[in-house]
């Protein structure tokens, strides 16, 4: 009887713990703002994971077997990986998949700063898990190619599958300038593609156009540094390779190159955004600004799957401007944008 009574108390206690956990989860989800933050975290996590799995997988093909992989294949893998990532999370978080893009949007007032750590944490975890996935899928191929050794440099190096490394013909600071400039061009063109008041991509084509931008950057300037242009792309896989057995050389190689793909893109994206706003964005007449947290704010995104409907407000993704088609004299007859998605992207 004593044992039975103890068992009942144990069962009752476990049930109380279970219900308290469930109640806590429900309490978290009852707040709209907290629910939105969780959704955006998961969206950045999944979109970055999708982009990196396709991108790193294409690099693995190029490194491990020239018959199945190529440099062009790597560019297409990352480019179309971005497309899939945008479709995974564009309407939820904007599918930045890039900490430099998130930082720039926060610095320029397009995204609240409280979302910055949420987005970046999701991006880093997604990138780390993608590296772990590629390692698991290509484990035997990696060992076969390298003779059982996990090397960072040399003809049988495999660390480059997961992260970028400074080539022999580049110096550290030339590499820094290269990464800064490429990320500057990336952000400038992203603002161009998504500015509804300028000459944006056609409704429903933004994901594809952005992937074309990524491919163009990679095929035209990839030889110098491997074009990280994304703080969420390099450090997490480097951390994984350090844990998996490649050793501390993943950080020390190339004159301690590891920090450049973090700092240079942050600087470059910020400059690219400012350059666009000063030289292009400021010259375009716009309606009064409505902040994201305003009661009147509805959406600040880009249509991926446009639908026909009534003339509802259109939102400029560049400055979060709410523009009604009914009161714009300069707007020609065109189908309205509806069901829009946020994209201040990668």
From Swiss-Prot:
Bridged cysteine pairs (disulfide): none
Segments in the Extracellular topological domain: 59-71, 137-174, 222-225, 240-257
Gene Ontology molecular function: glycerol channel activity; water channel activity
One Pfam family hit: MIP
Bilayer topology term: Multi-pass membrane protein
GO cellular component: basolateral plasma membrane; plasma membrane
Alphabetical UniProt keywords: Membrane, Transmembrane, Transmembrane helix, Transport
Intramembrane parts of the chain: 94-107, 226-239
Motif extent (NPA 1): 98-100
Keyword Mitochondrion on entry: no
Top-rank taxon: Eukaryota
Site residues by UniProt (Selectivity filter): 78, 227, 233
Compartment list: Membrane
Free-text comment about domains: Aquaporins contain two tandem repeats each containing three membrane-spanning domains and a pore-forming loop with the signature motif Asn-Pro/Ala-Ala/Ser (NPA).
Assembly, per entry: Homotetramer; each monomer provides an independent glycerol/water pore.
PANTHER family: AQUAPORIN OR AQUAGLYCEROPORIN RELATED, AQUAPORIN-7B
Task of the protein: Aquaglyceroporins form homotetrameric transmembrane channels, with each monomer independently mediating glycerol and water transport across the plasma membrane along their osmotic gradient.
Protein name in UniProt: Putative aquaporin-7B
Protein species of origin: Homo sapiens (Human)
Taxonomic lineage from the root: Eukaryota, Metazoa, Chordata, Craniata, Vertebrata
């Amino acid at each position: 009887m004593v044992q039975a009574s103890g068992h009942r108390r144990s069962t009752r206690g476990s049930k109380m713990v279970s219900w308290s956990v469930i109640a806590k989860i429900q309490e978290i989800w009852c707040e709209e703002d907290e629910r939105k933050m969780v959704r955006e975290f998961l969206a950045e996590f999944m979109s970055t994971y999708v982009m990196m799995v396709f991108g790193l997988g294409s690099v693995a093909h190029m490194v491990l077997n020239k018959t199945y992989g190529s440099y062009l294949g790597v560019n297409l893998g990352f480019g179309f990986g971005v497309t899939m990532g945008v479709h995974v999370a564009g309407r939820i978080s904007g599918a930045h998949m890039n900490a430099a893009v998130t930082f720039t949007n926060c610095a320029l007032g397009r995204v609240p700063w409280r979302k910055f750590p949420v987005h970046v944490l999701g991006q880093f975890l997604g990138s780390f898990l993608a590296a772990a996935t590629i390692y698991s899928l290509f484990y035997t191929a990696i060992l076969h190619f390298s003779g059982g050794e996990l090397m960072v440099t040399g003809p049988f190096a495999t660390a480059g599958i997961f992260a970028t490394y400074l080539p022999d013909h580049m110096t550290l600071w030339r590499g820094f300038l290269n990464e800064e400039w490429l990320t500057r061009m990336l952000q400038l063109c992203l603002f161009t593609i998504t500015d509804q008041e300028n000459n944006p991509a056609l409704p429903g084509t933004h994901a594809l156009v952005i992937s074309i931008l990524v491919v163009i950057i990679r095929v035209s300037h990839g030889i110098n540094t491997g074009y990280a242009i994304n703080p969420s792309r390099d450090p997490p896989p480097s951390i994984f390779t350090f844990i998996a057995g490649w050793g501390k050389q993943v950080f020390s190689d190339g004159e301690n190159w590891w920090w450049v793909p973090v700092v240079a893109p942050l600087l470059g994206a910020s400059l690219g955004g400012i350059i666009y706003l000063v030289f292009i964005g400021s010259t375009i007449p716009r309606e009064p600004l409505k902040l994201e947290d305003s009661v009147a704010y509805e959406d600040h995104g880009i249509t991926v799957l446009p639908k026909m409907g009534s003339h509802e407000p259109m939102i400029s993704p560049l400055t979060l401007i709410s523009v009604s088609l009914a009161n714009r004299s300069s707007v020609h007859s065109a189908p309205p944008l509806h069901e829009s998605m946020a994209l201040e992207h990668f």
